[in-house]
Amino acid sequence: MKSTILVTGYKNFELGIFQDKDPRITIIKKAIDKDFRRFLENGADWFIFMGNLGFEYWALEVALDLQKEYDFQIATIFTFENHGQNWNEANKAKLALFKQVDFVKYTFPSYENPGQFKQYNHFLINNTQGAYLFYDSENETNLKFLLEMMEKKEAYDISFLTFDRLNEIYEE
């Protein structure tokens, strides 16, 4: 039984999604909804986000809707206090949603060195029992480093949303 699940995955631009009305988002959110319901029915009581646009933002929207039906908490743990400060207004509005959850913190005041990202990843993994990732090793991004750390942690449960699964949901 997982109680705290880290949620992360591709950013919108990594998927070639640049419009909020892109029909692929509906399919992705349908998959997230199914998976989140399964996690909740199996005892999840926290979903932890990193504050990234794309998959995390869509998952956050789903999680906020599900809070009307299920009793669970949502947290955003940013890498830096100034996360998103250089974003455009539309993206800052999305960032604001990440700050309107049950728990919000950051691990560092600001960027000082690349080692902070490794420390941040360790912190996230050590404070969650599992992860839900939209990631495929054939379409690598920086998430591969986080995934490698997860795979090294004993009894860390990793669930994936894959492109194949999205195709199955699309065909339903």
Curated annotation (Swiss-Prot):
InterPro entries: YspA. Pfam families: YpsA. It comes from Streptococcus agalactiae serotype V (strain ATCC BAA-611 / 2603 V/R). It comes from the Bacteria. This is UPF0398 protein SAG0300. Belongs to the UPF0398 family.
